[in-house]
């Protein structure tokens, strides 16, 4: 019975080791890649702060899609012109 817990513990340990070996290394600047000097750490944080400020600025987007005229609006305009013609003919 002691064989199963030892085997299970070994399997979990092996899984963690393999996962750790394949993990991506993240540098000080929170960017994937190689190691960086601790001297450049402040520069990295300032770069991240600038990027965060750029994302915080509101972006204004303009709608470039023209809305088609409603068929009811066109029908209303046609009816108004017909009514004007009818009333204009009766007045003459």
From Swiss-Prot:
GO terms for cellular component: extracellular space. InterPro entries: GnRH, Gonadoliberin, Gonadoliberin_I_precursor. Belongs to the GnRH family. Residues 1-23 form the signal peptide. The record marks 26 as: Appears to be essential for biological activity. Stimulates the secretion of gonadotropins; it stimulates the secretion of both luteinizing and follicle-stimulating hormones. It comes from the Eukaryota. The keyword Secreted applies. GO terms for molecular function: gonadotropin hormone-releasing hormone activity; gonadotropin-releasing hormone receptor binding. Keywords: Amidation, Cleavage on pair of basic residues, Hormone, Pyrrolidone carboxylic acid, Secreted, Signal. The modification Glycine amide is found at residue 33. The modification Pyrrolidone carboxylic acid is found at residue 24. This is Progonadoliberin-1. It is found in: Secreted.
């Amino acid at each position: 019975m002691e064989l199963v817990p030892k085997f299970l513990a070994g399997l979990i340990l092996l899984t963690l080791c393999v996962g750790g070996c394949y993990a991506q290394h993240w540098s000080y600047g929170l960017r994937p890649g190689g190691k960086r000097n601790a001297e450049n750490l402040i520069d990295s944080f300032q770069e991240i702060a600038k990027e965060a400020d750029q994302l915080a600025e509101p972006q204004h987007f303009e709608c470039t899609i023209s809305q088609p005229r409603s068929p009811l609006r066109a029908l209303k305009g046609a009816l108004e012109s017909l009514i004007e013609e009818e009333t204009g003919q009766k007045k003459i």
